[in-house]
Amino acid sequence: MKQLVLIRHGESAWNLENRFTGWADVDLTPKGAEQALAAGENLKKAGYEFDVAYTSVLRRAIRTLWNVQDTMDLMWLPVVHSWRLNERHYGALTGLNKAETAEKYGDEQVHIWRRSYDVRPPLLEHEDERHPKNDPRYSKLNSSDIPLGECLKDNVERVLPLWNESIAPALKAGKRVLLVAHGNSIRSLIKYLDQVSNEDIMEVNVPNGIPLVYELDDDLKPIQHFYLD
């Protein structure tokens, strides 16, 4: 049996403020930090151990992983940081309050942007200061790989190369994998692992800071999965 544990980062400052976050690099709230520590405690009490960890290049996920590692006495654990595990890029909506955006564009339009599988939000302009090209952590990416806004379909297509090239081989080699990322990058993996339809995946919500344990067979097909809280 192969072991994969997925954790969405703890509550972030913009989660609390009800803003579209995406690739904006906001930090955890005190509550979010506590959620991360609690996740580590629950994993430790349940006897989980890990050989490698994966996370995004955004601090709310990285700090969540640090707190889990610290609680589990696993600060030595090898960690792979990848932009492919970043949150879905919300384009020109980044930083906007969700309720105020709904007032401006209408509830139905915002619902489509948030919950449609293949409809992108309004894209960033190339001159926008929020463009990822202005961030040094993405300086080595090809310009064609840098999103200006993503739907969940784009997010799935971004995450799967990392799964196929790194995470899946690690699992098949017997490594116990901890992955700390974001709501939509984790939903992308859930969709792939559980073969969830395009329609049904839109109703899947991933809670902050609660470990989602997958037990997989040798072909990496799910035997069972459950939340550990």
Curated annotation (Swiss-Prot):
Pathway: Carbohydrate degradation; glycolysis; pyruvate from D-glyceraldehyde 3-phosphate: step 3/5
Sequence positions that bind substrate: 8-15, 21-22, 60, 87-90, 98, 114-115, 183-184
UniProt EC number: 5.4.2.11
GO molecular function terms listed in the Swiss-Prot or TrEMBL record: phosphoglycerate mutase activity
Record-annotated site: Transition state stabilizer: 182
Disulfide bonds: none
Reactions the enzyme catalyzes: (2R)-2-phosphoglycerate = (2R)-3-phosphoglycerate
Keywords per UniProt: Gluconeogenesis, Glycolysis, Isomerase
Active site (UniProt): 9 (tele-phosphohistidine intermediate), 87 (proton donor/acceptor)
GO BP annotation list: gluconeogenesis; glycolytic process
Classification via Pfam families: His_Phos_1
SUPFAM superfamilies per record: Phosphoglycerate mutase-like
Origin superkingdom: Bacteria
Function: Catalyzes the interconversion of 2-phosphoglycerate and 3-phosphoglycerate.
The protein's assembly and partners: Homodimer.
Family: Belongs to the phosphoglycerate mutase family. BPG-dependent PGAM subfamily.
UniProt name for this protein: 2,3-bisphosphoglycerate-dependent phosphoglycerate mutase
Species in which this protein is naturally found: Polynucleobacter necessarius subsp. necessarius (strain STIR1)
Lineage: Bacteria, Pseudomonadati, Pseudomonadota, Betaproteobacteria, Burkholderiales
Gene: gpmA
